[in-house]
Curated annotation (Swiss-Prot):
Coiled coil: none annotated. One of its GO terms (cellular component) is cytosol. This is Aspartate carbamoyltransferase catalytic subunit. It comes from Solibacter usitatus (strain Ellin6076). Catalyzes the condensation of carbamoyl phosphate and aspartate to form carbamoyl aspartate and inorganic phosphate, the committed step in the de novo pyrimidine nucleotide biosynthesis pathway. Keywords: Pyrimidine biosynthesis, Transferase.
Length: 302
């Protein structure tokens, strides 16, 4: 199997630290007038997205171009899959064009892992079903490091639609490697009990106040209605019980930060006051996405 990035679970702590350290090297490019390097000059990256994406797809495009590579983005509606071609045949066709990496998002959990066994091209997982979203967890970790100075021993509350969240799973895998205390919180219908066994140090609760108490990091998640066959919790009641409001922050550590992988739904997962609060690092996450994905592309291709 060619080297790629399929998930956080398979990475060791040292590998994660190396990616995060390299991402820090790339951060200053954001404020420079000349943002382009020639690290991957002459390389080609194909972004193949079978699910809607703004942040991840655009971030990978910018990351590739800042490293000097060429990037082509293909959506499901613009691929031959929409004409009945199988996913394997589509990927084989792209592989025959000899790109240096394929960045792939798919609604089926495990799709990148399955295809990586058959393709000679490295695959970077940009999100597969409810399974993993490795680069999101890496950029979240970079953001936490920037504000908290460490990952070891932090209390991280992840709140929302845990059941359908690949972001939650990747963050659990990453943070547990650093000894963080992870509290997963949401309605019982969106909080599978087996997730307590996902990694060491994971605790489940349906009480948002318990989750937030003494937290260093509060990570809110979107309710993924598109993955639910029927509503798992009344939409009209969700914000009342699980929406983050300013008063909740008094329960957390004084310097606790608020995160969200986006897209955010104000008035459902968190209030506008919280989204725009000085301890919100939501836009920092977006910014760090570019540096982290530059580090990943360099590692996979360079």
């Amino acid at each position: 199997m060619p080297a790629g990035l399929l998930g956080i679970e398979e990475l060791g702590r040292a590998e994660i630290e190396a990616i995060l350290s390299r991402a820090k090297d790339f951060q200053p490019l954001q404020s420079q007038s000349l943002k382009k390097l020639d690290t991957l000059r002459g390389k080609m990256i194909v972004n193949l997205f079978f699910e809607a994406s703004t942040r991840t797809r655009t971030s990978f495009e910018i990351a590739a171009k800042r490293l000097g590579a060429d990037a082509i983005s293909i959506t499901a509606s613009g691929s031959s899959v929409s004409k009945g071609e199988s996913l394997v045949d589509t990927l084989n066709t792209l592989g025959a064009m000899r790109p240096d990496a394929i960045v792939m998002r798919h609604s089926a959990s495990g799709a990148p892992h399955f295809l990586a066994r058959y393709l000679p091209t490295p695959i970077i997982n940009a999100g597969d079903g409810t399974h993993e979203h490795p680069t999101q967890a890496l950029l979240d970790a970079r953001t936490i490091l920037d504000r908290c100075g460490q990952l070891d021993g932090l209390k991280v509350a992840i709140i929302g639609d845990i059941a359908h969240s690949r972001v939650a799973r990747s963050n659990v895998h990453l943070l547990s490697k650093f000894g963080a205390k992870i509290v997963l919180c949401g309605p019982a219908s969106l909080l599978p009990v087996e997730l307590a066994q996902l990694a060491p140090g994971v605790v489940l609760t349906t009480d948002i106040r318990d989750a937030i108490k003494d937290a260093d990091v509060i990570m809110m998640l979107r309710v993924q209605l598109e993955r639910q066959h029927e509503a798992s919790f009344p939409a009209s009641e969700y914000f009342r019980f699980y929406g983050l409001q300013l008063a909740h922050l008094d329960l957390a550590k004084p310097e606790a930060i608020v995160m969200h992988p986006g897209p955010i739904n104000r008035g459902r997962e968190l209030s506008s006051e919280v989204a725009d609060f000085q301890r919100s690092v939501i836009l920092n996450q977006v910014e760090n996405g570019i540096a982290v994905r530059m580090a990943v592309l360099e590692k996979v291709i360079g």
